[in-house]
Amino acid sequence: MSLITDLRIFVVDDEQIIAATLATILEMSGFSATAFTDPFQALRRARLDSPDLLISDVMMPEMSGVDLALRMKEECPGCKILLFSGQAATQDLLRTARNLGHDFRLLLKPVHPTDLLCEVRGKQRTDSAALVVSA
C-alpha cells in the first residue's frame, strides 16, 4: 500500500504487542509508523528522524508518556502528541503538563482503530492540543 501522507509517526508503549499493533494499524491505513518499547530510544531516534506525531502510552516504567511528550516537544517543537492510558494515575501526570501550558484532552481506552485513525487524521489538520486516551 502506498503512503497517503508524509506524516512520520512514532508509537511508544512498554508493551511490544500494543506498540506493534498500533503501528500496524497506522501502516495498513497508509501512514509511516515506527514502534518503540523504550521511550529513550524514541528520543534518540527523534534526533535523527524528527517525527511529526508521537503516540505514546502514559504509564511506562522508565519514563512517563507525559515526560516523553514534553521532552519530544523540546527536541522536535513541531511534533504533535497523542497519548493513551488505562491508568487512573494519568490525571496527576496531566496536571504537571497543564502547569507547563499543555492542555490535554482525556478519552477512554481501549481506542477502536477507527477512533485512532480519526484522531491521527485530525492531527494532520491541527497543530493544537494533545489528546490523552485513558480508562
What does each model-found stretch correspond to?
Residues 35-53:
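Acidic, metal-coordinating helix/loop segments flanking the phosphotransfer/catalytic sites
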Residues 16-34, 101-104:
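Two-component/phosphorelay signaling modules centered on CheY-like receiver
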Residues 67, 80, 88-108, 114-118, ...:
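Alpha4 helix (beta4-alpha4-beta5 surface) of REC/receiver domains from two-component response regulators
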Residues 60:
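Receiver (REC) domain active-site loop signature in two-component systems and cognate sites
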Residues 5-17, 22-26, 54:
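Conserved acidic segment of CheY-like receiver
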Residues 1-8, 112-135:
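Non-catalytic signal-transmission and effector/linker regions of two-component phosphorelay proteins
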Residues 37-38, 64-68:
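Acidic catalytic/metal-coordinating carboxylates
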